[in-house]
Amino acid sequence: RQNYFLSFKQVLLVGGPTLYMPARPWFCPMMSPSMPGAPSAGPMSDSNSKGSTPRSPARPTVSTGPPMDDLAASMERCSLDCMSPRPAPKGPDDSGSTAPFRPFALSPARFHFPPSSGPPSSPTNANCPRPLATVAPLSGTAFFPGTT
């Protein structure tokens, strides 16, 4: 029982919070084939009773290298998106409305799941949506509702 919980926690820790929310959207195609391996790794570890079993498949499945890159890129994009709207609203109203609206619309589309499951994905999800949300009110609370 403990071993299963540990392995489950490990798998969740290895591929859960890190690549769960942000990676899901763009890693959907890649994760789809890998996902079968992850679930099978869970039961496998249960019967094998080996913590390294789930870890091994989980690591390749997660591909710390590429995903990390993607994650970094996504974070960079996020930061850029969040930063972009900040100066934009300061400038012309028209330009500002387009700048924040664009990333905002893109973000929800990209992170469709994270917003819904905000609480669980708070750590990773907060990185992008949170700044955006903070930027929106910062740029102008009246301006945002006005656009909507």
Swiss-Prot record:
Residues 36-148 are annotated as: Disordered. This is Putative uncharacterized protein PXBL-II. Residues 36-45 have a biased composition (Low complexity). Residues 46-55 have a biased composition (Polar residues). It comes from the Viruses.
